[in-house]
Amino acid sequence: MGSLTSVDKSRIRQAFQKALNDYDRHALIQQKMTINLMAHLQDYLPNGSLDSVLELGCGSGMLSSLLQKQISADYWLFNDLCDVQTQLAEKLPQSFDFYCGDAEHFLFLQQFDLIASASAVQWFHQPDAFIAHCKTGLKTNGLLAVATFGEDNLKEVRQITNIGLNYPTLSQWQTWLAKDFELLWCEDFKVILDFDTPLDVLKHLKYTGVTATNQKNWTRKNLNGFIGDYLSAFGMPSGKVRLTYHPLFFIARYSHIENQ
């Protein structure tokens, strides 16, 4: 199965900018992921308010809203590749700063009690380096909370088109975290969605920004081929077609222990 090791960040920004107005209505899996991450994060947050919280790749503000509803912090900083500051201001009850730029190479000018990210790190070119990079932005015992996707995410589309992201496995994330972090919680699972037609699958991906991976222009011939191949490979007895999501989560504490 073909895969993309990386996608140009300008394509990602363009795809998500186009999808911004439709994202919340169609990104139902991503919404459930933020709820799941937040529910488990509550178990590890210290009592009382935090000094500072950073969310990387905040997008339309799904996780941002939950964070601000359930955490009191003296300073909030949100980041995204798209300039979503106006949209965030309409959603968020607490004041915040916003930095527009690439989350993977975020320039840490201070250290945070919590760095959170949902449905963003799968776009990073070097996720292992990102884990190491987060050490510079976390206080000792600071928390890193991430929701992303595992290796079987959107596997049907990847099989038909030979295009898709190269998703790290849960065991890879565990290995990358083991050096400097205490893994507090992790899990992954699969969710099967059904759609009336393969065309509806493509529309769903467009409305959630995933078409950033598509580096070719669809012709009528390509589209008809995709529809036929998808129906034959992933048609269900109901007449609908399936699409797999593979949510993956972890919460880790920066233990600040140097290798002996």
Swiss-Prot record:
One of its GO terms (molecular function) is malonyl-CoA methyltransferase activity. HAMAP family: BioC. InterPro entries: BioC, Malonyl-ACP_OMT, Methyltransf_25, SAM-dependent_MTases_sf. NCBIfam families: BioC. It comes from the Bacteria. Keywords: Biotin biosynthesis, Methyltransferase, S-adenosyl-L-methionine, Transferase. Belongs to the methyltransferase superfamily. Converts the free carboxyl group of a malonyl-thioester to its methyl ester by transfer of a methyl group from S-adenosyl-L-methionine (SAM). It allows to synthesize pimeloyl-ACP via the fatty acid synthetic pathway. Its EC number is 2.1.1.197. It comes from Haemophilus influenzae (strain ATCC 51907 / DSM 11121 / KW20 / Rd). This is Malonyl-[acyl-carrier protein] O-methyltransferase. It catalyses: malonyl-[ACP] + S-adenosyl-L-methionine = malonyl-[ACP] methyl ester + S-adenosyl-L-homocysteine. GO terms for biological process: biotin biosynthetic process; methylation. PANTHER family: ARGININE-HYDROXYLASE NDUFAF5, MITOCHONDRIAL. It is an enzyme of class 2 (transferase). Pathway: Cofactor biosynthesis; biotin biosynthesis. It holds the Pfam family Methyltransf_25.
